[in-house]
Amino acid sequence: MTKIAFTGGGTVGHVSVNLSLIPTALSQGYEVLYIGSKNGIEREMIESQLPEIKYYPISSGKLRRYISLENAKDVFKVLKGILDARKVLKKEKPDLLFSKGGFVSVPVVIAAKSLNIPTIIHESDLTPGLANKIALKFAKKIYTTFEETLNYLPKEKADFIGATIREDLKNGNAHNGYQLTGFNENKKVLLVMGGSLGSKKLNSIIRENLDALLQQYQVIHLTGKGLKDAQVKKSGYIQYEFVKEDLTDLLAITDTVISRAGSNAIYEFLTLRIPMLLVPLGLDQSRGDQIDNANHFADKGYAKTIDEEQLTAQILLQELNKMEQERTRIINNMKSYEQSYTKEALFDKMIKDALN
């Protein structure tokens, strides 16, 4: 029996593709294990959503692009992570490794190379992240969500495969969504998502302008972990820190979304034809990957975008109004998008590329 190791973590986006592919692997009779960090969001997601597979926690350090004393400590964490991962891989003897990226993946990919285990890596963003740039040196192939990403990668290793969307995305139940929220079916629903880490600035603007927003929408507010404000209670407004199983039902009742611009999330909105106002992570918090993603979607006519540095209540409300006026055009643009690979076709390609 072929055995597959998966890795990737740090954010929801570094786990969601794995969550899409693992059930396909299991349904076809493959044995699966997951290697991630000890305390990252990937551990919570994998152990809660796929309790039947083995999860191996390893030491991991953060990859920083700036000078910091923490870098010295993290070198030792990464080295320990390589040893941890090598021990797991020697024990489990997987036939291949699929890596979704994030800093935890680098020691796993290096360990796999040292044991001659073929590795396929996946890049969701328009420009490759630092972890995948390092991992690519030890991998057999890299798959990309954006076709334009091929311009940044060696031709012999890179393949464009498009977005990989999880199986249950289109199975959301609107009736369940309205029951969960207690919302009125005859009024539009606005979903606000600040990403897995949340956005304090976006959260603050939403709360300060709830009265204006509630004139037009009912609001589902995903605040991020630890950022829910229990004191804010209004009819037509509901807060969650983070939603797992019920998210598809909430998406089924969503008319418009305000969101960060992580690749996996925005491709899910695109697949569901939900017009989106994107507020990407700024350069002070990231390498600019979400800015590239957001601008690409805006150029395609799928979304509107606001730089977080320019985000004010007035601009947010203005852009929402503009988007509602252009709603039909945006949805028609979205209809031109077609998924490149089904999960099953992508999985078959992964097996073929790794083992041939």
Curated annotation (Swiss-Prot):
UDP-N-acetyl-alpha-D-glucosamine binds at R166, S196, Q290. It comes from the Bacteria. It comes from Staphylococcus aureus (strain MRSA252). It is a peripheral membrane protein. Its main location: membrane. Pfam families: Glyco_tran_28_C, Glyco_transf_28. Pathway: Cell wall biogenesis; peptidoglycan biosynthesis. The keyword GTP-binding does not apply. Keywords: Cell cycle, Cell division, Cell membrane, Cell shape, Cell wall biogenesis/degradation, Glycosyltransferase, Membrane, Peptidoglycan synthesis, Transferase. InterPro entries: GlcNAc_MurG, Glyco_trans_28_C, GlycoTrans_28_N. HAMAP family: MurG. Belongs to the glycosyltransferase 28 family. MurG subfamily. It catalyses: Mur2Ac(oyl-L-Ala-gamma-D-Glu-L-Lys-D-Ala-D-Ala)-di-trans,octa-cis-undecaprenyl diphosphate + UDP-N-acetyl-alpha-D-glucosamine = beta-D-GlcNAc-(1->4)-Mur2Ac(oyl-L-Ala-gamma-D-Glu-L-Lys-D-Ala-D-Ala)-di-trans,octa-cis-undecaprenyl diphosphate + UDP + H(+). One of its GO terms (cellular component) is plasma membrane. Cell wall formation. Catalyzes the transfer of a GlcNAc subunit on undecaprenyl-pyrophosphoryl-MurNAc-pentapeptide (lipid intermediate I) to form undecaprenyl-pyrophosphoryl-MurNAc-(pentapeptide)GlcNAc (lipid intermediate II). NCBIfam families: PRK12446.1. This is UDP-N-acetylglucosamine--N-acetylmuramyl-(pentapeptide) pyrophosphoryl-undecaprenol N-acetylglucosamine transferase. Its EC number is 2.4.1.227. The lineage of its organism: Bacteria, Bacillati, Bacillota, Bacilli, Bacillales.
